[in-house]
Structure formats: structure tokens, C-alpha cells
Amino acid sequence: MYRATSLLVSGVVLAGLSAGFLLADEASSEKTGKPSKAAIERTRKTVRMLDDVYKTAVVLITDKYVHDENDFPAGSAAIALFGEVEKKGWHGVRLIDVSGQPYDPENVAKDDFEKDAVRQLRDGKDYVEKVVEKDGKPALRAMTPIPVVMQKCVMCHPHYADAKKGAAVGAISYTLTIE
């Protein structure tokens, strides 16, 4: 009984210390105005999850609903979804052309972060991020590549037929408040 109680107390003490270190990290970040490492990591993890969800949705929509060039393109569906997400205040998300031949002129890198991130993605990076201030709050800007993953992509983007396997032809640009 004593051993079990001792282990339980030790576990509670360790949990308390761990929580204390996390709270200290959060508290020190509040004093400096900079986000804590833990907050940045949580936001980074959210970007990765959103990236997986959005890309999986586009592939599934393309696979199940895009059969010829008269069907509504999955990329256009993604852009509509991104607009709704941003309009509702969840986060900023944009589809960006990396190929140099955008399907829509709006889908080009617009600011310094996006232009630099596109260069890095073209050079083979698989993720680019930067912590910035947006509307007086810390935010994580991130960009991930979109390679051609299906033959159906060339129905709307015939120039993708020449893309090297795995090369970025597009990207998703994210802006999330760090909380």
C-alpha cells in the first residue's frame, strides 16, 4: 500500500512540475509578448492537421466526382471552402500557384512571406513557416507544397503533365493566430 501511495504521489508531483514548467513557459511568453514554444508547436500541429484534411478532401473529391473537364474542379471547390473558412474567422488559407502558370490569376504569391516560401518549395522544402504579428497578435504563417498526385489533375492543368514526380506545382498558404 505504501509503495502504491508513494508512486501515486511521485506521479502527481511530476505532473505538477511538468505543468508548472509549461505554465512558466506560457507566463514568460505573456511578459515578452512573444508566443511560447508550446503555443507555436500547438499551432504548427494544427497546420499539419488542416493540411492533411484539405489535401485529402481534394484528392477524394477528384477521385469520386471529377470525371471529365465539364465537372466542377476540386481545386475550385477547395478555394470556395477556403473562402468560407476565412469568412467565418477560423484562419487564413489560400491556394497558391507554384508552376508559374496559374489556373486563376488570384492564385499567386502576394506578399513577401508567400513569395519566399514559393521559392523554398520550388527548391524542394516540404514546409515553410514564420512567426509574425497580425492584428496585434502572434500568428504562424506556413506554406506546404501540392504535387501532382493524380492523372486527373492534367484535365484542368495540361502543363502539369510535364511536372517532375513529387515536384510542387501549387501550395497552400496558412495564417493561424497562435493562442
Predicted regions and their residues:
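Short Cys/His-rich local motifs and their 1-3 flanking residues in nucleic-acid-associated proteins
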Residues: 158
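Bacterial N-terminal signal peptides that target proteins for export
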Residues: 1-11
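Short, cysteine/histidine-rich loop/knuckle motifs that typically chelate Zn2+
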Residues: 155
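Bacterial N-terminal signal peptides
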Residues: 10-19
